[in-house]
Amino acid sequence: MKTMILLGEGYEEVEAITVIDYLRRAQIPIDIVSINETLSTIGDHGIEIMADKLLDDIDTDSYDMVITPGGRPGAEKLAKDKRVTDLIAQQVARDKYVSSICASPIALEAAGITKDLEGTCYPGFEDQVHYKTFHEDITYYDENHKVLTSRGPATAVYFALDIIRILKGDAKAQEVADGLLLPIVEEKKG
């Protein structure tokens, strides 16, 4: 399974880095793809990530999953970029995976796919993302459409683990969670 995470200026760094790191721990290939004209991308809090590739330079058909992080400015850029919204619509039409967190489901809305979806998003964006059914879950996976959504920065851990679970199964997701000491943290937090 080959994945990409799309970064435009103003993405939420926690959501991007968590997904990239966890997928690499799970040995799931993930390309960091810039929607800019350069590989340099700057997050909402001024952190620079150098992308692996430019969106214009890749064969998007070769990817099994497209991932979009939130951060209001970054999500708005994704939603306004026709290359991105066309890619998201094509992924769903081809029965491939899409995963969006925080504000980035507005790109799903812009792609015209939310009317049939069940999902979630960052609080306050419900009026911009018109799901068939909205869920307040930490993450929500619409199995019929292969679309995973999540709420925001604090849910990025669970979002990334759910991506692993979807692509590589429960055992691999648990292995990564165990290595991160997540079960111990959850037990102590009670």
Describe the role of every protein-language-model region.
Residues I17, S34-N36:
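Short glycine/proline-centered loop/turn elements that form peptide/ligand docking sites
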Residues L39-H45:
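Membrane-interfacial amphipathic helices and adjacent loop/beta segments
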Residues T18-R25:
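Short, solvent-exposed amphipathic alpha-helices that sit
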Residues M4-I5, Y11, A26-S34, D52-L54, ...:
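Active-site-adjacent pocket-lining segments in enzyme domains
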Residues H45-K53:
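Short gly/ser/thr-rich secondary-structure transition/capping motifs
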Residues A16-T18, C121:
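Hydrophobic side chains within alpha-helical segments
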